[in-house]
C-alpha cells in the first residue's frame, strides 16, 4: 500500500494522478479501477523486476574490445550462476552482468581484484536509477501551449502569418529529411541482397508534404515480379559527400553500426553508463508543435524508448540464418505471413541499428514495425500497400497546387489534436482529417483544388496508373495545371471550414473527393462507388479506393463532438479576438483555438443521446427530472423555434458591424444543409457556451443567437417539415421561472398556434449539493424501507417521488429542499436538440472541477429516467 501511495498524487482541484502511468482520474473509484488494471499492474511488476535485476547486477569495464559475452559469462560463473550479460555493442567498452542472486553478486564485489586475459577489470555495483515508464509518451490532445510557441505566433501580424509560422515550427528540417533518405538508402541496400530488383519507397508523412517532427518512417517494399529474372535496380541515390558531411549524422554510422541481435534493445537510459554515440545528437522532437522549438538534430540515447538493459546477447545475425528461418516458416504459414516474417528476420539480423522488430499480420495492411537506434526513428515496412504510395503523391500534388493547403492542414491537425478529435481508435486519423480539408477546398466557389475526376482527365500518357483495379491516374507535375482563381485569405478559409463542417450531414451523405460533392447515402449510385463501402456516422471516401471509408472507425459520439467543436470554433472566428491582434497582450488569432481542451470542455462537446419520443414530451420530462428528481434550480432558459411556413430566413452566419461576414460561407452552408438534410441546423447556443469554457470569452448573455449587438437574442426559425411534435400544441419548458412548466406550456401553445414549433430548448441549472454521489446506496436503502412497509411496485409518479426523496436525503434535509444563500456548487447549461435527439451539457461555473463526474452520471441516469417517465 505504501508503494501505491507513493505512485498516487492528489490534485488540488480534486481527482488523482498516477505518477507511474501518467494517468489522471476524477475520483477514488476510478483510481481504484486504474490501480487494478492491466497497465498499472504490468508497470508495477516491470519496476519490481528492474529493481531486482539491478540488485543482482554489476557494471564491468576495462576489458579488451575483442572480448565477447561468452568469455565474460565463463569468468563470472566462477562466483556463481550468471543470468545474463549485456554488452555495449557500439563501442565495446563496458558490460552489465546480471548474477543469479544477490549473494553471488556480493561475492563478486568482495573480490579485491578481477583479471581477464591479462587485463584488470573494473567491477562495481550497478547504479540504481529511478524507474521511468517505458510508455512515457506525451499525453493525448497535447497542444502547442509552450511559452516560446505562444510568443512566436503572437508576434505574427495576422492570422494567415500565424498559420504559415506554425508550418515552419512543425515541419521536418532539411537535416531530418536527409537523415530519412540515408535510412531509406540503407534499407534499399540490404533488401536488394535478398530480393534483386526490389525498390524501397517511402510514403506517408515523409513524402506527402505534411511531415512533423518525430513522425514515423513508412516504407513500401515493392518486390515486383520476383519470378522473372530482372537486373537489380540501383539503390536510391544517396546524398553527396558534401551534404552527408553537413548532416548531423555521419553516414558511416548507418553503414558500420553492427547489426542488432534479434529483439535486442539498447541499455536503459536510466543507467549512468548509458551508451555514448560517436555522432553529435539531441532529442528528436515528438509530434507536437512544442518540439519544433527544440534542436533540429538527432535523437540522443535518453530520448530513445527505454528498454530492459538485461538482454542476453544472441550474437550477430547473418543472411544464412534469415534464409533458414524463411524456409522453416514457408512450410508452416501462408505465403504472405511467411514473407512478412522473412522481412522481419532481415530487419533483425541484417540491417544495422534496427531493434524492436514486430510483425503485425492482422492489420488491414500487414506491416513489420521497427525502430532504428542511430536515428531514433520508428517505422514500418509493408509489402502490399502500393495504393498508399499513390495517396501520398496525391496529397503532395495538392500541396503544390496551392500554397494555402499546407498551412490549413497543419493548423487543423493541431487544433484537432488539442480537442481530442484525432488519434487512434474511434478518433479521426491524420489522413482522414487531411482528406476532409481537401474536400472542403474542392467545394469552395470558385474551387481552391480540382476534383480527382478532373485531375484524372488531365493525366498524361505516362501517368495512367491502375492499382488493384482502381484508377490512380493524375498529373505528377503541378506546374502544368492552371492555378485556382480563388484568392480568399487563409483566415477566411479556416473560419469557413469550421462553419461548413458543423452543418454537413456526415451520416446521411458520402463526401466524395473524386466528384467533389456530397453524395446522398440513400440515393441510387453506381455500384463501383458502393461495393464493400462500410458506412457509419461519418462517411469520407478515399480518393482512389472507392470502397474504403477512411472515417469508418469514427463513432457517433466523436462525429457529434467534431461538429460541436467546429461550431464553437466558428463562433470564435466571428469575434474580434480572432480577427485582430490584441493591443493588451491577450492571446488572439490561432492561440485560443490551439489551446488544449480541459476534460470539462471535451465532455461539453459530447452529446448525450436521448430515448426516442416526441420532442415536446421529451423536453417536458427532461425539465421535470432536472428540477424535481435532481433538485436543480432552473434559473432561466431559452427556446429555439422553427417555422412551419416557408419563407426567407436570415443566415445563421450573418450579422453586421462587429461580426465578421465570410463571403460565400452562407451560400455553401445553407445550400448544403437544405440539399442534404432538408432543414437548417444551428448550434450557436452550444458553440457560444463551449467558447466560454475553452477560450474564456466574456459573454454577458449566457445564450445568444448571432445578431446585432445590444439587441435581444434573435429567434432563428428553422425550416422543417411539419411533424407530429409541431402540431401537438406543447413546447418544452423554455422561459421557466417561478411559475414552473405551466407558464412555459402556455407560451409555447400561443406560438404553436401561429404555425411555429419548437426546435431546441436550453435551461440554465444550478446545483448546491453533490446529488450524484452515493445515489445508488441511498436508493437501495429507501427501496428496502418501502418493501418493509408493504408497498407495491412504483409507478411513474412513485419513481419520481423516490428519486426526489433520494436527492433530499443526499442534501441532508428532511423536507423539500430550499435554495441556500451560498454560491452554487456547479452551474451548467443543458441544451436539448430535436435535430439529432441529443442533450448537450456545458459547464458555466465549476470552481471545484466536479463537472466530469456530473457528466458521467448524467450519461447513464438521464436516459433511464426519461424511459421511466
Curated annotation (Swiss-Prot):
InterPro entries in the record: MTPAP-like_central, NT_sf, Nucleotide-bd_a/b_plait_sf, PAP_assoc, RBD_domain_sf, RRM_dom, Star-PAP_RRM, Znf_C2H2_sf
Regulation: Adenylyltransferase activity is specifically phosphatidylinositol 4,5-bisphosphate (PtdIns(4,5)P2).
Molecular function as annotated in GO: ATP binding; enzyme-substrate adaptor activity; mRNA 3'-UTR binding; poly(A) RNA polymerase activity; RNA binding; RNA uridylyltransferase activity; U6 snRNA binding; zinc ion binding
Domain of life: Eukaryota
Binding sites annotated in the UniProt record for ATP: 205, 391
Domain RRM as annotated: residue spans: 56-128
Zinc fingers (Matrin-type) by residue: 16-46
Compositional bias annotation for Basic and acidic residues: 637-648, 660-686
Positions contributing to UTP binding: 216, 218, 391, 413, 431, 548
Protein name: Speckle targeted PIP5K1A-regulated poly(A) polymerase
Amino acid at each position: 500500500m505504501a508503494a501505491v501511495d507513493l505512485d498516487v498524487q492528489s490534485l488540488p482541484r480534486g481527482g488523482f494522478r498516477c505518477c507511474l502511468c501518467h494517468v489522471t482520474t476524477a475520483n477514488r473509484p476510478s483510481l481504484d479501477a486504474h490501480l487494478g488494471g492491466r497497465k498499472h499492474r504490468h508497470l508495477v511488476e516491470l519496476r519490481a523486476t528492474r529493481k531486482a535485476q539491478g540488485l543482482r547486477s554489476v557494471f564491468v569495464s576495462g576489458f579488451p574490445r575483442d572480448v565477447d559475452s561468452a568469455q565474460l559469462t565463463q569468468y563470472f560463473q566462477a562466483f556463481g550462476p550468471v543470468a545474463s550479460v549485456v554488452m555495449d555493442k557500439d563501442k565495446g567498452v563496458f558490460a552489465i552482468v546480471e548474477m543469479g542472486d544477490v549473494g553471488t553478486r556480493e561475492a563478486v564485489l568482495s573480490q579485491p581484484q578481477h583479471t581477464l586475459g591479462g587485463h584488470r577489470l573494473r567491477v562495481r555495483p550497478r547504479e540504481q536509477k529511478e524507474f521511468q515508464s517505458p510508455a512515457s509518451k506525451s499525453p493525448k490532445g497535447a497542444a502547442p501551449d509552450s511559452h516560446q510557441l505562444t510568443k512566436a505566433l503572437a508576434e505574427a501580424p495576422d492570422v494567415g502569418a500565424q498559420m504559415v509560422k506554425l508550418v515552419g515550427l512543425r515541419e521536418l528540417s532539411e537535416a531530418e529529411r536527409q537523415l530519412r533518405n540515408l535510412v531509406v538508402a540503407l534499407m534499399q541496400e540490404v533488401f536488394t541482397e535478398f530480393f534483386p530488383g526490389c525498390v524501397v519507397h517511402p510514403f506517408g508523412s515523409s513524402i506527402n508534404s505534411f511531415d512533423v517532427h518525430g513522425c514515423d518512417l513508412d516504407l513500401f517494399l515493392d518486390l515486383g515480379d520476383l519470378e522473372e529474372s530482372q537486373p537489380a535496380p540501383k539503390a536510391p541515390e544517396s546524398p553527396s559527400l558534401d551534404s552527408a558531411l553537413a548532416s548531423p549524422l555521419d553516414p558511416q554510422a548507418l553503414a558500420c553500426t553492427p547489426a542488432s541481435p534479434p529483439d535486442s534493445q539498447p541499455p536503459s537510459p536510466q543507467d549512468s553508463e548509458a551508451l555514448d554515440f560517436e555522432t553529435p545528437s539531441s532529442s528528436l522532437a515528438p509530434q507536437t508543435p512544442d518540439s519544433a522549438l527544440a534542436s533540429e538534430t538527432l535523437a540522443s540515447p535518453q530520448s530513445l524508448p527505454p528498454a530492459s538493459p538485461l538482454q542476453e546477447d544472441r550474437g550477430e545475425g547473418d543472411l544464412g540464418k534469415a534464409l533458414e528461418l524463411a524456409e522453416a516458416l514457408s512450410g508452416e504459414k501462408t505465403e504472405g505471413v511467411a514473407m512478412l516474417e522473412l522481412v522481419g528476420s532481415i530487419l533483425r539480423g541484417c540491417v544495422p541499428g534496427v531493434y524492436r522488430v514486430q510483425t503485425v499480420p492482422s492489420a488491414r495492411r500487414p506491416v513489420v514495425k521497427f525502430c532504428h537506434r542511430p536515428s531514433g526513428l520508428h517505422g514500418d515496412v509493408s509489402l502490399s500497400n502500393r495504393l498508399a504510395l499513390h495517396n501520398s503523391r496525391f496529397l503532395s500534388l495538392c500541396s503544390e497546387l496551392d500554397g494555402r493547403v499546407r498551412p490549413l492542414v497543419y493548423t487543423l491537425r493541431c487544433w484537432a489534436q488539442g480537442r481530442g478529435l484525432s488519434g487512434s481508435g474511434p478518433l479521426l486519423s491524420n489522413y482522414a482529417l487531411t482528406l476532409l480539408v481537401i474536400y472542403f477546398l474542392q467545394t469552395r466557389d470558385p474551387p481552391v483544388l480540382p476534383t480527382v475526376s478532373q485531375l484524372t482527365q488531365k493525366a498524361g500518357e505516362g501517368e495512367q496508373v491502375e492499382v488493384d483495379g482502381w484508377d490512380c491516374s493524375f498529373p505528377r507535375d503541378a506546374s502544368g495545371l492552371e492555378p485556382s482563381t480563388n484568392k480568399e485569405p487563409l483566415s477566411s478559409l479556416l473560419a469557413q471550414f469550421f462553419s461548413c463542417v458543423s452543418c454537413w450531414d456526415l451520416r446521411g451523405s458520402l463526401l466524395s473527393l473524386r466528384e467533389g460533392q456530397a453524395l446522398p447515402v440513400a440515393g441510387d449510385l453506381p455500384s463501383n462507388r458502393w461495393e464493400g463501402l462500410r458506412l457509419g456516422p461519418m462517411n469520407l471516401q478515399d480518393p482512389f479506393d472507392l470502397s474504403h471509408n477512411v472515417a469508418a472507425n469514427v463513432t457517433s459520439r466523436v462525429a457529434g463532438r467534431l461538429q460541436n467543436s467546429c461550431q464553437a470554433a466558428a463562433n470564435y472566428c466571428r469575434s474580434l479576438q480572432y480577427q485582430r491582434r490584441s493591443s493588451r497582450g491577450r492571446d488572439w488569432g490561432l492561440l485560443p483555438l490551439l489551446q488544449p481542451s480541459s476534460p470539462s470542455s471535451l465532455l461539453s462537446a459530447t452529446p448525450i443521446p436521448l430515448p426516442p419520443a416526441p420532442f415536446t414530451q421529451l423536453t417536458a420530462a427532461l425539465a421535470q427530472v432536472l428540477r424535481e428528481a435532481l433538485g436543480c434550480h432552473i434559473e432561466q432558459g431559452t427556446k429555439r423555434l422553427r417555422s412551419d411556413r416557408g419563407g426567407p430566413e436570415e443566415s445563421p452566419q450573418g450579422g453586421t458591424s462587429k461580426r465578421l461576414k465570410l463571403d460565400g460561407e452562407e451560400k455553401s452552408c445553407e445550400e448544403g444543409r437544405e440539399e442534404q438534410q432538408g432543414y437548417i441546423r444551428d448550434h450557436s447556443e452550444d458553440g457560444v457556451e463551449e467558447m466560454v469554457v475553452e477560450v474564456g470569452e466574456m459573454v454577458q448573455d449566457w445564450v445568444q443567437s448571432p445578431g446585432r449587438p445590444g439587441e435581444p437574442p434573435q429567434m432563428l426559425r428553422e425550416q422543417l417539415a411539419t411533424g407530429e411534435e409541431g402540431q401537438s400544441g406543447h413546447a418544452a419548458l423554455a422561459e421557466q421561472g417561478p411559475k414552473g412548466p405551466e407558464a412555459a406550456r402556455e407560451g409555447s401553445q400561443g406560438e404553436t398556434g401561429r404555425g411555429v414549433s419548437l426546435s431546441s430548448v436550453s435551461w440554465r441549472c444550478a446545483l448546491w449539493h453533490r446529488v450524484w454521489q452515493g445515489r445508488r446506496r441511498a436508493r437501495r436503502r429507501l427501496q428496502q424501507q418501502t418493501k418493509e412497509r408493504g408497498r407495491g411496485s412504483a409507478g411513474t409518479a412513485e419513481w419520481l417521488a423516490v428519486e426526489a426523496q433520494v436527492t433530499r436525503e443526499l442534501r441532508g434535509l428532511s423536507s423539500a429542499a430550499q435554495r441556500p444563500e451560498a454560491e452554487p456548487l456547479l452551474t451548467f447549461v443543458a441544451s436539448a436538440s430535436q435535430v439529432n435527439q441529443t442533450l448537450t451539457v456545458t459547464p458555466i461555473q465549476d470552481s471545484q472541477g466536479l463537472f466530469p463526474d456530473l457528466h458521467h452520471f448524467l450519461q447513464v441516469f438521464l436516459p433511464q429516467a426519461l424511459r421511466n417517465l
